[in-house]
Amino acid sequence: KRQPADRKRFHELRSESDAILIGGSTARREPYKKTPVPLFIITHSLVRLQPKNQLAKQLNLPPAAALQEISNFFAQKERAQILVEAGPKLLTKMIEERLIQTLYLTINHDATGENIIDLADLVKNFKLLSSVKVENDEFQSFELA
């Protein structure tokens, strides 16, 4: 369950973004009925995953091609801020392909889950910019090295 400090941080990041990108698994698990900016979903599913969100668009493309498609959507802007709220599978793939420039992590030291990630491996090509602890959450930001 998302903690108040984590929820606040998510809302701040969303307010600074032009679009949100999620994977199909995240779209099936999380409610994205209303987003302040367009929502793009990378999925192989033909079923509309967020039917109540008028700003949602599904892309049946690999991550690099999906980002190009999203960039075309924002062609009038010099640079679009795309917030990726992905699970471990999509996030790892995007990091391996060097598609993530800035990485924001929330580490909850009390939580356990089925999707355990090797953090050292995940951030090996990134440089730590900041780390702030609020209660049991640790907020870290990294930049691609």
What are these model-derived regions, one by one?
Residues 1-145:
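Enzymes that bind and transform nitrogen-containing heteroaromatic metabolites
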